[in-house]
Every structure is written in structure tokens, then in C-alpha cells.
């Protein structure tokens, strides 16, 4: 898979989850933050990143930088949905994604909704099965979306021409 140049895309970023973590040291607790970020151009390109820092804005900035390095292309058809049903898995998290007819909207939970909207998928049905941890849901969604191929790609792979 070829690497995508983020400078060529008009990317918008979205914070999926921010968590405060504590490291217990001799003098007490030292707090830092981790931010899970999703970036996308609304036309099929989407990526996610995890940034960690002592301050929230710095964690978000680091997450955006990492997300720009993890961009993938998602095949979106003319109904602004995915071509076929697929399930993504990561750890204990599973995300079932089904194509929806035009006008349905994004039927998804928080973490999955952010990904679909960033990718420009406006009609989709999804269900989180197993873990609802935002990290697992995001990674499961990406695992499923990476496996998606457009109908043209599948036809070419199978040697079918119309």
C-alpha cells in the first residue's frame, strides 16, 4: 500500500478520547494526558493517532501528527457508504459495519462515529460488540476499513470484466 502525503489533503482532526493517567512517584502522583485523535478529509482518507504529553494541547498535537502518518484510503461509493458488510476486530473489541441506503445517516457510537464522519461515510450502520473501550473500537474500525476493497478492485482481482 502506498504512503499518502497528508500535505495534499485538507484534513480535519477530531478528538475521540482524552484520558488523564497518573504515575506514582516518591513525592506523590505525576499526572499526564493521552489523546486519541482521528483525522480525515471527508472524501475517503482517514487516520488515527495516540499522543501522550504532560499537557492536553501538546498531547492533541502529537496525536494529530501520528494520525497523519497512519492515513488509509477507504472505498466510499456514490451513496456515501461502504461497499459491503465487514467486521473489524482488535483485542476484545469487535465492530460490525453494514452499508446503509441513502438518507440513513451514521448509526454508530462515539468513537466509531468520529471515524466514519472523518472518512466521509455518511450512511452506515454499525454495532460495537465486546469491548467498548475507545482505543479498541478505533483500532477495530481501522482493521475492518483496511480490509475493504472497492467492487472494481475485487472484480480485477478475480479476473471479471464487464
Curated annotation (Swiss-Prot):
GO terms for molecular function: rRNA binding; structural constituent of ribosome. InterPro entries: Ribosomal_Su5_D2-typ_SF, Ribosomal_uS5, Ribosomal_uS5_bac-type, Ribosomal_uS5_C, Ribosomal_uS5_N, Ribosomal_uS5_N_CS, Ribsml_uS5_D2-typ_fold_subgr. It comes from the Bacteria. Gene3D superfamilies: 3.30.160.20, 3.30.230.10. SUPFAM superfamilies: dsRNA-binding domain-like (SSF54768), Ribosomal protein S5 domain 2-like (SSF54211). Residues 11-74 form the S5 DRBM domain. The keyword Nucleotide-binding does not apply. The keyword Iron-sulfur does not apply. Keywords: Ribonucleoprotein, Ribosomal protein, RNA-binding, rRNA-binding. PROSITE patterns: RIBOSOMAL_S5, S5_DSRBD. It holds the Pfam family Ribosomal_S5_C. Transmembrane segments: none annotated. GO terms for biological process: translation. One of its GO terms (cellular component) is small ribosomal subunit. Belongs to the universal ribosomal protein uS5 family. PANTHER family: MITOCHONDRIAL RIBOSOMAL PROTEIN S5. HAMAP family: Ribosomal_uS5_B (MF_01307_B). The N-terminal domain interacts with the head of the 30S subunit; the C-terminal domain interacts with the body and contacts protein S4. The interaction surface between S4 and S5 is involved in control of translational fidelity. With S4 and S12 plays an important role in translational accuracy. Located at the back of the 30S subunit body where it stabilizes the conformation of the head with respect to the body. Part of the 30S ribosomal subunit. Contacts proteins S4 and S8. This is Small ribosomal subunit protein uS5. The gene is rpsE.
